[in-house]
Amino acid sequence: MSTPIDTSAARAAIFKRIRSAHRRPASATAEELGAVEDYLARHPQGPRPLIEGDLRIRFRAMSERMSSTVDEVPHLADAPAAVARYLDAQGLGRQAVIWPALAMLDWAGAGVAVEARPPRRDESQGADPVGITGCFCALAETGTLVLTSGPQAHASTHLLPETHVALVPASRIVKGMEDAFALLRAERGGEEMMPRALNMVSGPSRTGDIELTIVLGAHGPYRVHIIVATED
């Protein structure tokens, strides 16, 4: 089994060398960071839809329009039992790969066997049919999951398995994409904190390349099931 690689140190070293080649300090100065924030604050934004009311309700409605299925539980601690019910209803085995960040939940108590590792890439070794992830945040405007990669959050977990189950705290639902990027800058804006990859998932993978007929699961998960923790 491969060991996840933390690339943040390598990325920081590359940026340091680039800045050094331009005879600039190794890290961004407070003045430079302030200039960036000022630019972002002043930069004109395009028209945005008016989103009012409960973001959770809007997110659920839009997710279901994108062919995701949605369940709700009070807390993330209740998610393992909800996952077990979903897997049983779909006729799937109670096995999954999971983000290491979620491994502390009581999966064994719910009867779900999880492995905190990336999915197998070689199908000859046995494909992993279910991947369980969290999310960085979610967009009420479009019913979209925003997922960032890292040592505790493998990007392949929501890309390779046929079924993707995502756990979403209601407190992490924001209005739209602009709000998600603002949250990312606020929480992970440092040079060594930005994720290597950011993916936005709006329902199952699909294509209409052949005769404009929509086919699900063409380039990724066939199913996307979202469990919202309403009080987290």
Where are these regions (language model features)?
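The feature marks the mature, well-folded catalytic cores of soluble enzymes
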Residues: 1-232
